[in-house]
Amino acid sequence: AKVAFLLAALTLALAGCGKVQEKASEKMVEKAIESSMSKDGTQAKVDLSQGGMKMSTTDASGKTTQMEMGNAKISEADLGLPFYPGSKPTEGSSMRLVSGTSSTLQMGLHSDDAPDKVAAFYRDKLKAMSEGKQLMDMSHNDGASLTLVDEKAKSSLQVHVNKAEKASDIAIAANREGAK
């Protein structure tokens, strides 16, 4: 029993060491990224602790950039387009990049519906928003790529729908210049 207790204690200690090691290597990577960016006068703050990557930078001229990759919280309002009904976010697929007055948002979703049904939903949504804008619709065997460009507002929305096994993968990207 004493040996079993010692083995259990050793196992717990080693598991704890794994967490400590993981945290230490995370911090080492953060510092390496920050250090490499500082060579051209850019100040960076990198955080890998939340399951994704958050980074904020200020370059030598004072321009700031914020980036979240993997776990950015992105809403329908942020994108300017609804999520397909019943779809679920694809883990690790969201990204937000804000640089000066420009922003780029990306979101991955998964639906159990067929690609043609999902594409029809987004085609209708983009058509309803298309007055005075350019709508491009490229269908292919396994889905569709839809793009709405607003040259006046310097913005675009892209929706890519692709066939997944018995379902659909959806990628939505919103780009805006001069965003607040």
Cite the ranges covered by each PLM segment.
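C-terminal motif of bacterial Sec signal peptides marking the signal peptidase cleavage site
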Residues: 13-16
